Amino acid sequence: MLMGCKNSNTNDQTSIYADEMVLIVNYQLENMTLEEHAELGSAVAPSFTSENVPGLLGKSFIGNLETEIFGGVYYFSNQKDVDVYLESELWKGVVAHPNLVNFKTDVFKKMIFLEKTN
């Protein structure tokens, strides 16, 4: 579960993301150096725009050098947009890359808790 906090006294637009979903993707490298992985990331990063991926609010590349697990955290407007992405040619191309292996995906609903007022 991913949690966020919202101050109920503020009048922000958090509610427009009430259905926001988070997709976390992990994978390992096989026969690929960190430098080659960085080059690949730089090459594909421009593809991750809201024009190319409907409903995408943002994406961060992640990695742990000690465990050698890498991946991404994607923020989507809703579950339907996550599902569309996971069926897209862009996603199919990512998981088909021969040097990216052992994919794991998890989807979470962003939780928003209102601050209690007295």
Give the residues covered by each predicted segment.
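Conserved RNP beta-strands of RNA recognition motif
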Residues: 72-76
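Short S/T/G/P-rich N-terminal loop/turn motif that feeds into the first structured element of a domain
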Residues: 1-69, 80-87, 103-118
